[in-house]
Amino acid sequence: MSAFAFPLLTRCIDESDTIIDETSTVTDDGSSSTNSSTTSSDCTLTNTETAGPYPTHSPGSLVREDIRGDRTGIELDVEITILDQSQSCLPLEGALVDIWHCDKDGNYSEYSGYTSSSFLRGRQAADENGKVAFTTIFPGWYNGRATHIHVHVYTASGKSIKVTQIAFPEGSNSAVVQVNSSTANGYTKGMSGYTYNSSDNVFSDGVSTEMAIVSGSISEGFKLTHSIVAAS
């Protein structure tokens, strides 16, 4: 499996500038409009998912916090905490975390017409609290998939310990709906034809360990927080 990296963002404004703070529990089918992140209290392993079809070719060359590159869109600050089930879910300091996702139009770098680009892909090493942070843009979507971010976690020595994906909460006032309605910021697809988590070919079996917490607004940008439980 490969790993990942990421590009830059622009801040955006539209009429739906409501603060989102989606922290209530999500059901296993992902149908709730709110969500909860994995916590260390239950120490349940995060679901393993496919890295494909667009994994990063050489993630070790993309060590960076700001992964936006030349991509524009609504800013999304991502904070991921890596917990080690093998150590009673203590933070896994030094874990290498690769992330990657599509741009606002559903395109991935390194593939198709973007083979010479590496936007929206990046790697960071977890600090003493098991945390990594990235600055990116709010992902768009493409046919057959709900909004998501790919993650590949390694130990500091390079052992692969988790390949997974991050799901986003859904609902009428969710960030997903607000962002995809923000044509002023270049999100032109809207929600017509969108694949929800419950019908997604990756998330349809449940998203309880993959659901992020997303808060913020169109004008100020959004923040995503999520915990991933792996076993070293």
Label the model's feature ranges.
Residues 19-39, 112:
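Ser/Thr/Gly/Pro-rich low-complexity, disordered linker/stalk segments of secreted
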Residues 1-14:
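N-terminal export signals
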Residues 209-232:
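C-terminal, well-folded lobe of enzymatic/effector domains
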Residues 36-197, 203-204, 230-232:
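Beta-strand-dominated extracellular/periplasmic modules and repeats
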Residues 16-17, 47:
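Extracellular/secretory pathway and lumenal proteins
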Residues 11, 17-18, 24-25, 65:
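Residue-level marker of intrinsically disordered, low-complexity segments enriched
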